[in-house]
Amino acid sequence: MSVDAATVRKIAQLARIAVTDAEVPHLQGELNAMLAFVEQLSEVNVEGVEPMTSVTPMAMKKRQDVVTEGDIADDIVKNAPMTENNFFLVPKVVE
């Protein structure tokens, strides 16, 4: 996979990063190098290797699934600037 100049500009726009035309070739090379490294990783034989979620073995602490105080939705949303039907209202952030 190779990244072209138009893709670099699109990524910069999506990330809201100002990129000049002079910077595009350098970033294109950097992104292509990263993708080449990821392609190398796909060649590694991982058959029989257990997936890891941490470098040290860990177990999640579990709690009893019991009913606690409920019906406090009004208390939860009372400090929110905008709510509707006990849901938080937030400004639209996706174009």
Swiss-Prot record:
InterPro entries referenced in this protein's UniProt entry, alphabetically: Asp/Glu-ADT_sf_sub_c, GatC
Superkingdom in the source lineage: Bacteria
Gene3D superfamilies: Glu-tRNAGln amidotransferase C subunit, N-terminal domain
One biological process term in Gene Ontology: glutaminyl-tRNAGln biosynthesis via transamidation
SUPFAM superfamilies documented for this protein: Glu-tRNAGln amidotransferase C subunit (SSF141000)
A Pfam family assignment: GatC
Top-tier EC class: ligase
Tagged with keyword ATP-binding: yes
GO molecular function terms listed in the Swiss-Prot or TrEMBL record: asparaginyl-tRNA synthase (glutamine-hydrolyzing) activity; ATP binding; glutaminyl-tRNA synthase (glutamine-hydrolyzing) activity
Keywords: ATP-binding, Ligase, Nucleotide-binding, Protein biosynthesis
Catalytic function, reaction form: L-glutamyl-tRNA(Gln) + L-glutamine + ATP + H2O = L-glutaminyl-tRNA(Gln) + L-glutamate + ADP + phosphate + H(+); L-aspartyl-tRNA(Asn) + L-glutamine + ATP + H2O = L-asparaginyl-tRNA(Asn) + L-glutamate + ADP + phosphate + 2 H(+)
Enzyme Commission numbers on file: 6.3.5.-
Protein family per UniProt: Belongs to the GatC family.
Subunit structure: Heterotrimer of A, B and C subunits.
Function as written in the Swiss-Prot or TrEMBL entry: Allows the formation of correctly charged Asn-tRNA(Asn) or Gln-tRNA(Gln) through the transamidation of misacylated Asp-tRNA(Asn) or Glu-tRNA(Gln) in organisms which lack either or both of asparaginyl-tRNA or glutaminyl-tRNA synthetases. The reaction takes place in the presence of glutamine and ATP through an activated phospho-Asp-tRNA(Asn) or phospho-Glu-tRNA(Gln).
PANTHER family in the cross-refs: GLUTAMYL-TRNA(GLN) AMIDOTRANSFERASE SUBUNIT C, MITOCHONDRIAL
Protein name listed in UniProt: Aspartyl/glutamyl-tRNA(Asn/Gln) amidotransferase subunit C
Organism: Bradyrhizobium sp. (strain ORS 278)
